[in-house]
Amino acid sequence: VIKKHYYSWTDIERMCVSIVNQMYADNWRPDYIVGLTRGGNIPATIISNMTGIRCEALKVSLRDDKQGPESNLWMAEDAFGYEREPSATAGPLRKNILIVDDINDTGATFNWIKEDWPSGCLPDDKSWGTVWGNNVRFATLTENLASDFFDVQYTCHEINKAEEDVWLVYPWENVAEY
């Protein structure tokens, strides 16, 4: 029998406050927030409302959507600082982007982004390595310590599915009573 852990809306609000506090403790502010469908949209929107920072959505549902993830070139260009028509008056071109998901479970979602974004925007440029963890950062409500992705900057609740298999139920998933 798999153990289940249920998060309440109060838990989610506290976790989002914690992410904002961690981000500001780093003196880092994103130009925009990206909520990953489906689980990252709600916490990204809450963080956006708390901070007044605009929010975008990106579909990277590797498990539940048979159509697969969507590539997003303009976010990759923002992350890299790519400019199609260079301007002499332009300031810093790289945008600070916070990518939010409910859980870093296996690492597949975040690893997909780290592979996809460079593939569409100057894939051979070595400076992509300076983007991740600097101007593009990752935030999750829950971090699985057994994940294959080790670059989440902001998180609130840690689990280790290699030690104890647990099924996490977020309030937007707990719809049995409807």
Which residues make up each language-model segment?
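Active-site-facing substrate-recognition patch
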Residues: 1-30
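Short, well-ordered alpha-helices that flank and scaffold nucleotide-derived cofactor binding pockets
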Residues: 21, 45, 49, 115-119
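A general structural motif
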Residues: 29-30, 92-96, 133-135
